[in-house]
From Swiss-Prot:
PTM info: Contains two covalently linked bilin chromophores.
Annotated residues for binding of (2R,3E)-phycocyanobilin 2: C153
Sequence positions bearing N4-methylasparagine: N72
PANTHER family in alphabetical order: C-PHYCOCYANIN BETA SUBUNIT, PHYCOBILISOME 32.1 KDA LINKER POLYPEPTIDE, PHYCOCYANIN-ASSOCIATED, ROD 2-RELATED
Membrane topology: Peripheral membrane protein
Record keyword Membrane present: yes
Subcellular localization(s) per the UniProt record: Cellular thylakoid membrane
Annotated protein name in UniProt: C-phycocyanin beta subunit
Gene3D superfamilies hit by this protein: Phycocyanins
Protein species of origin: Arthrospira platensis (Spirulina platensis)
Keywords: Antenna complex, Bile pigment, Chromophore, Electron transport, Membrane, Methylation, Photosynthesis, Phycobilisome, Thylakoid, Transport
Source organism phylogeny: Bacteria, Bacillati, Cyanobacteriota, Cyanophyceae, Oscillatoriophycideae
Positions bound to (2R,3E)-phycocyanobilin 1: C82
Gene Ontology terms describing biological process: photosynthesis
Length: 172
C-alpha cells in the first residue's frame, strides 16, 4: 500500500530522477486540500451503515430475484454476507481516499474479487449495481457543502468516484 507521497517518491527513485516540478505541485495541492479529504472520509465513514443499507435496499428493490428463494441474497446468512462485502468495499474506498491512492483498494480488496464471486456463483453485475448505489450516496454526502471545509470539492469527488468505478469494474 502506498500513499500518494510514497508512490511519487518511489517512482522517481526507480527512474533515478529528482522529483519534477509537476509532481511537487501535485503533492502541494494535495496537502492544501487535505482538510477536505479528511472531511470526506469522516462523513462517508460516519454514514457507512446508512450508505450500505440504503444501497442494498435499493438494489434488492430493483432486483428482487436476489432475495427470492434461490437468490444469491436469500436467507439471512447470505444477506449478511452481501452487506458485509458491500461494507468492506466501502471501507477500502475510504482508505484509498485517505491515502490519495488506489493501491490499498486494489491490493487488499479488489484483487481476485471477481474470481471469488464467480466461484461462489454471485452475480458480479448485481454487486456492481450495489457499488454504484454506494457511489451515488457517498458523492451526495461529499458534495453537500454543510460540514465540509469550504472550497471546490469537484476534484476530490471525481477521485472518489474513480475508486468506486474501479470496484465496479473489478466485480463485473
Amino acid at each position: 500500500m502506498f500513499d500518494a507521497f510514497t508512490k511519487v517518491v518511489s517512482q522517481a527513485d526507480t527512474r533515478g530522477e529528482m522529483l519534477s516540478t509537476a509532481q511537487i505541485d501535485a503533492l502541494s495541492q494535495m496537502v492544501a486540500e487535505s482538510n477536505k479529504r479528511l472531511d470526506a472520509v469522516n462523513r462517508i465513514t460516519s454514514n457507512a451503515s446508512t450508505i450500505v443499507s440504503n444501497a442494498a435496499r435499493s438494489l434488492f428493490a430493483e432486483q428482487p430475484q436476489l432475495i427470492a428463494p434461490g437468490g444469491n441474497a436469500y436467507t439471512s446468512r447470505r444477506m449478511a454476507a452481501c452487506l458485509r462485502d458491500m461494507e468492506i468495499i466501502l471501507r477500502y474506498v475510504t482508505y484509498a481516499v485517505f491515502a490519495g491512492d488506489a493501491s490499498v483498494l486494489e491490493d487488499r480488496c479488489l484483487n481476485g474479487l471477481r474470481e471469488t464471486y464467480l466461484a461462489l456463483g454471485t452475480p458480479g453485475s448485481s454487486v456492481a449495481v450495489g457499488v454504484g448505489k454506494m457511489k451515488e450516496a457517498a458523492l451526495a454526502i461529499v458534495n453537500d457543502p454543510a460540514g465540509i471545509t469550504p472550497g471546490d470539492c469537484s476534484a476530490l469527488a471525481s477521485e472518489i468516484a474513480s475508486y468506486f468505478d474501479r470496484a465496479c469494474a473489478a466485480v463485473s
